[in-house]
């Protein structure tokens, strides 16, 4: 039971019945789930499970039944309770066999126009099939923090206590180096 809260240990997999369920989802509507951004920032892997669905994170049109989440914390053990929010469900209307995504795509020309009105980035943006981003390893001076690495041994993170923790308790700063390069440990979270 998650009533009083439960600790989900890192490197373990849990399947939890969700409070939400669906009752006669119209056949013209399907749903797709994804982790909330805060879940990803904590390196917690989540997937939605619907009975008789052929894939994770999908709910077919016409579905009625319970929903479950597979939860696997990778870098930090987390505390959750009834009502904690780790995943989100997005509904899509199906039209003549084709899915109509809710949302829109902005063209490169529109992105350039937007940048002229309200700058999207400092300096000149790289716009090619969308706005391109890259990481900055050089820093403006040697020793400047350019990123963070998750600490291997930390206290538990209560996912419902937003902005309640000190960065230094969970993350180790990565300083810029004069060589302007960085070797990452593939078993760590950055």
Where are these regions (language model features)?
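DUTPase catalytic domain/fold
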Residues: 1-190
């Amino acid at each position: 039971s998650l009533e009083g809260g439960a600790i989900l240990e890192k490197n373990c997999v849990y399947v939890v019945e969700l409070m939400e369920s669906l009752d006669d989802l119209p056949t013209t509507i399907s749903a797709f789930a994804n982790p909330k951004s805060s879940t990803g920032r904590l390196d917690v892997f989540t997937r939605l499970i619907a009975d008789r669905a052929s894939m994770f994170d999908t709910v077919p049109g016409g579905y009625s039944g319970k929903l479950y989440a597979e939860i696997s914390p990778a870098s930090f053990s987390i505390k959750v309770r009834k009502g904690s929010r780790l995943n989100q469900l997005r509904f899509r209307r199906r039209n003549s066999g084709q899915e109509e995504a809710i949302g829109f795509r902005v063209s490169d020309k529109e992105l350039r126009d937007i940048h002229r009105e309200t700058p999207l980035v400092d300096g000149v943006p790289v716009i090619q099939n969308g706005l391109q981003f890259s990481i900055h390893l050089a820093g403006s001076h040697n020793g400047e923090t350019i990123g963070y690495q998750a600490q291997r041994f930390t206290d538990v993170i209560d996912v419902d206590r937003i902005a309640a923790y000190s960065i230094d308790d969970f993350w180790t700063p990565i300083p810029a180096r004069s060589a302007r390069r960085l070797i990452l440990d593939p078993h760590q979270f950055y």
